[in-house]
Amino acid sequence: MQFDDFANHVITIEAESADLEITSLVSKLLTTAGNMDDKTLSTVVRFIKGTVFPAWSSQTLDIGPALLHTTIAQAAGPNVDSADVENRLAEYGEIGAVAASYDLNGQQGLSAFTPSTPDSLTVGHVDKTLRAVASASGDGSESRRRNLLFGLFSQASSSEARVLARLILGEMRIGVGTGTVRDAIISGFIEPAADADKKTLESREDAKSVPPASQPEITNKISGDTSPNTSESVQTKKSDPDTSSNVDPSAVVERALQVSNDYGMVATIARNQGQAGLIDISLELGRPIQAMLAQAADGVDAVDTWDAVAIETKFDGARVQIHTDGESVSLYSRNMEDVTDPLPEIVEFISQKVTVPAILDAEVVAVSDDGDPLAFQEVLRRFRRKYDIDAMRESVNLNVYVFDCLHIDDADLLDIPLRERREKLRELFNTTDALSPFQLTTDPNVIAQARSKALSNGHEGVMLKDPDSTYNPGSRGQHWLKHKPDVETLDLVVTGAEWGEGRRANVFGTFVVSARTTADEQQFNSLGKVATGLTDDQLTTLTEQLRPHVRSEDGQTVMIEPAIVVEVGYEEIQRSPTYDSGFALRFPRVVGIRHDKAISDVDSLSRIKHLTTGESPD
């Protein structure tokens, strides 16, 4: 597929605002690419989402704005420098428009940098080149990366340059999210195949005499129903195409995406094998999936909702997904970054304890020499360490607590109940020492006692889980609840913002929130950025209220005069050098816009310190 064709599809999608029409246009793009080889289709799916690599891959381009600006300037000609690119960025507001504003196509001397460059850009060549950019390392790697990018931009038309620049920074800005791509796969490949199957069935002379196909195993696999024979549900089964055609296609595609964590792969299988092929996708060692997530819970209402409640300790640690083939071990963070090398003691522990292929969900916790839990930041010190790992290992001790299993000994376990997964976990380790504490109860008092014990031991609280629930990757439903102490909200003032993307390109999508430096001053220090908690309508309203207070703009970033107060919830306040207050909010969210409060009512840093350290406020 010519990259120019892809770019024109992207620009057409960008001009559309209606969600259904955007899905239709993406579907048209996929079916166009679908007439080509598997690799091209897979690449187009990733590109339309603004990524070069599958979601499960920890590989990144790692191209910052500065290098991109320099490369665009180089491709634009000798009279253009990066300062000119940055000036245009301030004028146009986004890098794609800046790249499109230059006459890049036709630069000479390409053969010195990319001797295998085709006469025109193709999707495959762009993908191959960007992968080479990501792989460049060692002495001279930055120069090689710049030359490779220069080779692409030097051949790019205006539309190609617009899309290429956005793709490199992972900012497509066209309103295409994961749900859009999922629905486009359904409408492009699943529904047409289902219609064709239906017509074939209707054309049979004996169609009326054919009884409905039985499909218990497929329904169980897609719906997560665990009431029938669950021992069969973990076995490897091939789907009957006639049966699978009766399953909700949305559920089939969603489940395939959860298990594979690869949109390109799912699109290719949907085209080639239909629903039956998607149903047969299974977990794979070395291909991490999204973690199942929990919602915050204010009380013990779960007792009234579930038949029983599973209680686990809520650690103040970092989530890891453990993959082992019974010998070698790989560790992945919640963001699917490979963290195997920084955590050698966890690798050693799992290697000793687990001798069969397995995928496990666990929490890594930093502990003192006495075994007491340390703050979350200490764990991050280990995760981020690339050098002198042995020295850091001596400095920060780690424990691992395994609390779930997704795959054991060639069997996927996502669709069996939590209580059964925990039993398999106990059998796998043949001990409870490595496992997160686990107990079942129907008594609210037991939950309260467990939470009190966890808090007194220095942990965050408890997790409450439905013992009959299946494991839904990437889902934040009502089956896992975080039961922690109530945290007060903060009244903070908006002092900056960033423009949104896609459908939210004309409103602020992220806000910098700040506290007063002292209780009697009108000076402010930032505590972080918040991007959740507001509806589209609320974002529009808040943007209009903030516009008169804009001090300056620099590309996507806006400086704002302190005027509008927002109520912000959070999970924790941490010390951080990132913001000038010296603190940062963990998982902040806007609870509401406080029009009833003036900036003099904004919380002070002394209160922040009090909430963090217990020091008396001024």
Curated annotation (Swiss-Prot):
Q: Where is the active site?
A: 314 (n6-amp-lysine intermediate)
| InterPro entries on file | ATP-dep_DNA_ligase (IPR050191), DNA_ligae_ATP-dep_bac/arc (IPR022865), DNA_ligase_ATP-dep (IPR000977), DNA_ligase_ATP-dep_C (IPR012309), DNA_ligase_ATP-dep_cent (IPR012310), DNA_ligase_ATP-dep_CS (IPR016059), DNA_ligase_ATP-dep_N (IPR012308), DNA_ligase_N_sf (IPR036599)
Tree of life domain: Archaea
Q: Where is this region: Disordered?
A: 197-250, 459-480
Q: Where is the composition biased (Polar residues)?
A: 216-234
Biased-composition ranges, Basic and acidic residues, are: 197-208
Q: Cite a single GO BP annotation.
A: lagging strand elongation
Name the positions where ATP binds: 312, 319, 334, 363, 403, 476, 482
What GO molecular function annotation could you give as one example from this UniProt entry?
metal ion binding
PROSITE patterns for the chain? DNA_LIGASE_A1 (PS00697), DNA_LIGASE_A3 (PS50160)
Write out the entry's keywords from A to Z: ATP-binding, Cell cycle, Cell division, DNA damage, DNA recombination, DNA repair, DNA replication, Ligase, Magnesium, Metal-binding, Nucleotide-binding
This enzyme catalyses: ATP + (deoxyribonucleotide)n-3'-hydroxyl + 5'-phospho-(deoxyribonucleotide)m = (deoxyribonucleotide)n+m + AMP + diphosphate
What cofactor does this one take?
Mg(2+)
Query: What EC number(s) does the entry state?
Result: 6.5.1.1
Q: Which family does it belong to?
A: Belongs to the ATP-dependent DNA ligase family.
HAMAP family per record: DNA_ligase
Q: What does this protein do?
A: DNA ligase that seals nicks in double-stranded DNA during DNA replication, DNA recombination and DNA repair.
Per its record, how is this protein called by name?
Answer: DNA ligase 2
Q: What is the lineage of its organism?
A: Archaea, Methanobacteriati, Methanobacteriota, Stenosarchaea group, Halobacteria
